From Swiss-Prot:
Segments of this protein annotated with the region Disordered: 1-27
GO molecular function: DNA binding
Keyword DNA-binding: yes
Name of the featured protein: DNA-binding protein Rv2175c
Length: 146
């Protein structure tokens, strides 16, 4: 980027992989500087995680954003997400397809949230990553990918 110092933490949006915005318009997201702040790393490291497939993002309103649901309440990436993304990328899925699958309610997926006995049916796979069904989502991804 002209005028930027080598090693600058500001990455060009066009050079960062991101899928089409297939998310609900009300789905909360973080921009890359906020993700960097949460993770305690430079924005360039977040861009690297996106390029390496450890995170996925969408293009929204001229920028690149990452869904808030990919992070825990303490600001860390949900434990099973990077491995799940690797499985799906290795299976040939692109970021847009991955986002669509993660955020589409699945009538066969029922989750129970930590601290609750109430089952939520027709859950989204991304929500199951925060529940006891994370392994089930990974298993389903493996079956889809191979």
């Amino acid at each position: 980027m002209p005028g930027r110092a080598p090693g600058s933490t500001l990455a060009r949006v066009g050079s960062i992989p991101a899928g089409d915005d297939v998310l609900d318009p009300d789905e909360p997201t973080y921009d890359l500087p906020r993700v960097a702040e949460l993770l305690g790393v430079p924005v360039s490291k977040v861009a690297q995680q996106l390029r390496e497939g450890h995170l996925v993002a969408v293009r929204r309103a001229g920028g690149v954003v990452i869904p808030q649901v990919f992070f825990t309440n303490s600001g860390q990436v949900v434990k099973s997400l990077p491995g799940l993304l690797t499985i799906l990328h290795d299976g040939g899925y692109r970021d847009t397809e991955i986002m669509r699958w993660l955020f589409t309610p699945d009538p066969s997926l029922t989750i129970t949230r930590d601290g609750s006995r109430d089952a939520v049916s027709n859950a989204r796979p991304v929500d199951a990553l925060h529940a006891h069904q994370a392994r089930e989502v990974v298993r389903r991804a493996q079956a889809m990918a191979y």
